[in-house]
Amino acid sequence: VAGTIAAVNDNGIGVAGIAGGGKGRKGVKIMTLQLFDGMNSCSLAMEARAMKYAADNGAVILQCSWGYNSSKANLIMGYTPGPATEEEWAATYPLEKEALDYFIYNAGSPNGVIDGGLAIFASGNEYARQSSFPAAYSKCISVAAIAADYTPASYSNYGSEVLLCAPGGDLEYYGTPGEDDDAYDENGTLKEQGAIFSTLVVNGVAGYGYYEGTSMACPHVSGVAALGLAYAKQQRRHFTWEE
């Protein structure tokens, strides 16, 4: 995710980030805030502290490749449905909504490039006809995933709450490395992949790999948003978060 946004370009290493800069061009700055502990658990209090810290310390884009299951998630597939409406989500997770609103209304500056913040979320991967929350919140930008041929990815949530789609990959096209024989040619060489190649933790070590999901689509939108704001700053333009 971070590599998709801000990996340095033109350095002969790894991948090129959408807003990574390179060869004398400045890239965007990333503020990394840990939400989940080592057991993959996150409390609402931890989440709220991170969002408030981001708003208070200069971040203007909230890149969130996480969320609950869609309320339309397939029970047969073992999914536990999440909130169905904005009202239900707000009533169930009031601290989360309050923290998001704080970021959206208090990030940025009236004198800067943007007054307020952009909250960008992955729509979810249950192939459901509704985006998951918090992505489905009307003040957030919900991002669905498309495959290499620009068609909807086989796993991506969709529906009226989704505002944008971006490359998220789809391993259904070529097979999963290490799992499917058709991912390799007759010489055992990895063939073309339908997933996103990015910086990735491999066996606990920083590396590179292929990954799919709306979580990979989301940073494409965040990266483009960062580029747009950087250009607007050069032009001395000003926007509100709604614009």
Predicted feature residues:
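Aromatic- and histidine-enriched alpha-helix N-cap/loop-to-helix transition segments
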Residues: 42, 91, 95, 216-223
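Short, glycine/serine-rich, charged loops/turns that create anion-binding
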Residues: 9, 37, 124-126, 147, ...
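Hydrolase catalytic cores
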Residues: 2-6, 31-36, 52, 60, ...
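Amphipathic, non-transmembrane alpha-helical secondary structure
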Residues: 45-56, 101
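Subtilisin-like serine protease catalytic core
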Residues: 1-46, 57-60, 67-72, 114-115, ...
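Alpha-helix N-cap/helix-initiation motif
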Residues: 43, 85, 89, 209-214
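Catalytic-core segments of hydrolase enzymes
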Residues: 1, 60-192, 197-198
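Short helix-coil transition/hinge motifs at the ends and kinks of transmembrane helices
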Residues: 24, 39, 76-87, 200-205, ...
